[in-house]
Amino acid sequence: MAPPLLSLPLCILPPGSGSPRLVCYCERDSGGDGDRDDFNLYVTDAAELWSTCFSPDSLARLKARFGLSGAEDIHSRFRAACQQQAVTVSLQEDRALITLSGDTPALAFDLSKVPSPEAAPRLQALTLSLAEHVCNLERRLAAAEETITSPKKNTQPAGTQFLPELDHQRGSSGPGVRRRCPGESLINPGFKSKKPAAGVDFDET
């Protein structure tokens, strides 16, 4: 049976800008009856794999010892520890010790080295899942950058939003402009133009 898909979150150790040496992640397997209590923590250096290798009985004993209600509690604690960079791992021969600390009491788990035939498909699944997550993040980042850099399209033609509406005003005077009556003086509006002077007739007696 193929290994289950990677269940985020995960973390790399040591945290920060240094070169990573270990990857810590978790898997939740669903049983045939839909039970989700099959839960394991994993640590890998990309060559070897360590696992908690929980059985239903050992997981039940772990929950009773730490006062946990279910595997979901371990998953949420692991997520919180990853976000707070509060995960530590110690490798010892064929075993590893992982500690989850942070804002809650620390939880410590013993991990055993997974045999190579079983570890190989799990490491392959981890690599493919990480590659898929990276590709999805790159696509989302490219879409976000395109949205930010592309100007919003304006459906109204450029230059028309500031033009006055002149069509209905053509052939009519604008507001406050009075039409000149025939014969009205151009110099003194409102007064009729006078007739041209006829001069003085000196021959008239």
From Swiss-Prot:
Q: Which UniProt keywords apply?
A: Chromosome, DNA damage, DNA repair, Nucleus, Phosphoprotein
Membrane-spanning regions, if any? Answer: none
- Comment field on protein domains: The N-terminus (residues 1-115) forms a head domain that is structurally related to those of XRCC4, XLF/NHEJ1, and SASS6.
Q: Which family does it belong to?
A: Belongs to the XRCC4-XLF family. PAXX subfamily.
Q: Where on the chain is Phosphoserine found, per UniProt? A: S150
Q: Which Pfam families match?
A: PAXX
Q: Which GO terms describe its molecular function?
A: DNA polymerase binding; molecular adaptor activity; protein homodimerization activity
Name of the encoding gene? Paxx
Q: Give the top-rank taxon of the lineage listed in the UniProt record for this protein.
A: Eukaryota
Location comes to: Nucleus; Chromosome
Q: Which GO terms describe its biological process?
A: DNA damage response; double-strand break repair via nonhomologous end joining
Q: What does this protein do?
A: Non-essential DNA repair protein involved in DNA non-homologous end joining (NHEJ); participates in double-strand break (DSB) repair and V(D)J recombination. May act as a scaffold required for accumulation of the Ku heterodimer, composed of XRCC5/Ku80 and XRCC6/Ku70, at double-strand break sites and promote the assembly and/or stability of the NHEJ machinery. Involved in NHEJ by promoting the ligation of blunt-ended DNA ends. Together with NHEJ1/XLF, collaborates with DNA polymerase lambda (POLL) to promote joining of non-cohesive DNA ends.
CDD domains per record? HD_PAXX_N (cd22286)
Read off the InterPro entries from this record. PAXX, PAXX_N
Region spans: Mediates interaction with XRCC5/Ku80 and XRCC6/Ku70 and association with the non-homologous end joining core complex: 172-205
Main location as per UniProt: nucleus
Looking at the record, the residues that make up the PISA domain are 39-81
What are the record's GO terms for cellular component? Ku70:Ku80 complex; nonhomologous end joining complex; nucleoplasm; nucleus; site of double-strand break
- Protein's recorded name: Protein PAXX
Q: What happens when the gene is disrupted?
A: No visible phenotype in normal conditions. Mice are viable, grow normally, are fertile and have normal lymphocyte development. They however show mild radiosensitivity. Mice lacking both Paxx and Nhej1/Xlf show embryonic lethality caused by severe defects in classical non-homologous end joining (NHEJ).
Residues covered by region (Disordered): 147-205
The UniProt entry annotates the motif XLM at 191-205
Could you describe the post-translational modifications of this protein? Phosphorylation may inhibit interaction with the DNA-bound XRCC5/Ku80 and XRCC6/Ku70 heterodimer (Ku complex).
Residue ranges annotated as compositionally biased, kind Polar residues, are: 147-159
